[in-house]
């Protein structure tokens, strides 16, 4: 579906919400892209920012899930030495990867051109820089060789820039600061294979938030405690994996 040229910001917002209700996330992305373009000179509201994130997260989420399934089937076919199937699966995987690359390129362009330059508040800067790190990390998940190295370096730069602002301007219990720590630590664990660094980062974020839990406002309590639970789940999983590897060694 082509997005009409003459839509206002309010119409884009309404249609994006409509597409979300209908679970048509590719169209939701198009409406939010247009909203960003028509409101280029002003910052997005928190609602608009969250809708943009939800739209892209759903589109990229289904593609990442598809890629994992196809890659796992590819490994099975290689194990069975089924050459004809391997060729077909590889070709199919490269199509999924091409779509993944396009989606990441789309949001990264919007972040660099509009959203990061126009972000005034510390909270929005962290939100968009974290988002930039996330989409470079999704590229690093499937790219190989030099492209993977570059995507990982770009991820690190974005997360580091976000972290510098988050530590200076956001409370340890702030859901955006916690979400950044969660994703940054996952990057260390999954992409850089630096499990000790991943654990120490997640542990520090969790403990700093616990220490200030009584300062949490009603509105962000649910978001913050949910992310803290995810940090703790990862810590439990990672430390047991590290223990198993040590036992095997």
UniProtKB/Swiss-Prot annotation:
Record-annotated disulphide pairs: none
Domain of life: Eukaryota
Protein name: 14-3-3-like protein D
A GO cellular component entry from the record: cytoplasm
Biological-process GO terms, alphabetical: protein localization; signal transduction
PROSITE patterns per record: 1433_1, 1433_2
SUPFAM superfamilies xrefs: 14-3-3 protein
InterPro entries referenced in this protein's UniProt entry, alphabetically: 14-3-3, 14-3-3_CS, 14-3-3_dom_sf, 14-3-3_domain
Organism: Nicotiana tabacum (Common tobacco)
Organismal lineage: Eukaryota, Viridiplantae, Streptophyta, Embryophyta, Tracheophyta
Stored Pfam families: 14-3-3
Sequence similarity: Belongs to the 14-3-3 family.
């Amino acid at each position: 579906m082509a997005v009409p040229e003459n839509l206002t910001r309010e119409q884009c917002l309404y249609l994006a919400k409509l597409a979300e209700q209908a679970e048509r996330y590719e169209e939701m992305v198009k409406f939010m892209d247009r909203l960003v373009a028509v409101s280029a000179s002003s910052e997005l509201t928190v609602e608009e920012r969250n809708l943009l994130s939800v739209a892209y997260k759903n589109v990229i989420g289904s593609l990442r899930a598809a890629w994992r399934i196809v890659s796992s089937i590819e490994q099975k076919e290689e194990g069975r030495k089924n050459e004809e199937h391997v060729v077909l699966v590889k070709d199919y995987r490269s199509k999924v990867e091409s779509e993944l690359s396009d989606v990441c390129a789309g949001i990264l362009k919007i972040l660099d051109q509009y959203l990061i330059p126009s972000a005034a508040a510390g909270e929005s800067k962290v939100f968009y820089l974290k988002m930039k790190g996330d989409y470079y990390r999704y590229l690093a998940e499937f790219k190989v060789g030099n492209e993977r190295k570059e995507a990982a370096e770009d991820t690190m730069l974005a997360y580091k820039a976000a972290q510098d602002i988050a530590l200076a301007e956001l409370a340890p219990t702030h859901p955006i600061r916690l979400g950044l720590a969660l994703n940054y630590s996952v990057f260390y664990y999954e992409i850089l294979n630096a499990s000790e660094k991943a654990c120490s980062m997640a542990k520090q974020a969790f403990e700093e938030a616990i220490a200030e839990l009584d300062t949490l406002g009603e509105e962000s309590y649910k978001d913050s405690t949910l992310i803290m639970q995810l940090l703790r789940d990862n810590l439990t999983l990672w430390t047991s994996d590290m223990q198993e590897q040590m036992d095997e060694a």
